[in-house]
Curated annotation (Swiss-Prot):
Its main location: endoplasmic reticulum. The keyword Methyltransferase does not apply. The active site is at 97, 148. It is found in: Endoplasmic reticulum. This is Deoxyribonuclease-1-like 1.
Amino acid sequence: MHYPTALLFLILANGAQAFRICAFNAQRLTLAKVAREQVMDTLVRILARCDIMVLQEVVDSSGSAIPLLLRELNRFDGSGPYSTLSSPQLGRSTYMETYVYFYRSHKTQVLSSYVYNDEDDVFAREPFVAQFSLPSNVLPSLVLVPLHTTPKAVEKELNALYDVFLEVSQHWQSKDVILLGDFNADCASLTKKRLDKLELRTEPGFHWVIADGEDTTVRASTHCTYDRVVLHGERCRSLLHTAAAFDFPTSFQLTEEEALNISDHYPVEVELKLSQAHSVQPLSLTVLLLLSLLSPQLCPAA
């Protein structure tokens, strides 16, 4: 391949983009917690990795923690403004939690959302379902279903999550769904034998992309795959590039004690490679300029 042709190929290939979706149990996130400088700094750095992040275990009753966190995130990250979408407070007693989506609003928008109607009261914190747009012609939208199970009813809640999937896929006429969150799906909360009997494991089409055995906990004394991401849909799966827990203590050089001030969980992440979507994107001015400079070499005179 001639040099100009190779350069042109690289220019066009670089028009592709990755899209990262994350879930993080932020462990009793309150205003007092985010007001601590190291906690705020670390949370902002974690959030800035993601195009969509769903935070779990937000227990702030003041209503001020998320706006403060959003303000600092937008000050930190220069790749475009973030917005948030919060569920109502969810729970059965005085202890209530909120699911909060942070998303880069120049890359994705909320198309619709609702709290799952848990008529049988199976879930301690019913899923807060949201449909997001994606910058892709192959997969223009995607449904996210977050769930933070209670350890005492993991198996029951995860079996009910299959019913949520059925309702959601019918509601939006889409099979492209990601189930994600702190499922507590390991160790004492759910044995491997019981895990493998879940409908989300036995029914075809569900891909558990955080591998069994991958540690999603901060403490050195634990090794549990509590946090999960489950993909469904051929289009969604075809775009999958990577999936992993993010070991933020190692990446940010934190001691275990410092990391536990943030959370006892790692975030879990999936990266969709939208380059495989073959979406048509407008060429930047830089690319157009380079093409004009290369044109005499690409099309030599006869």
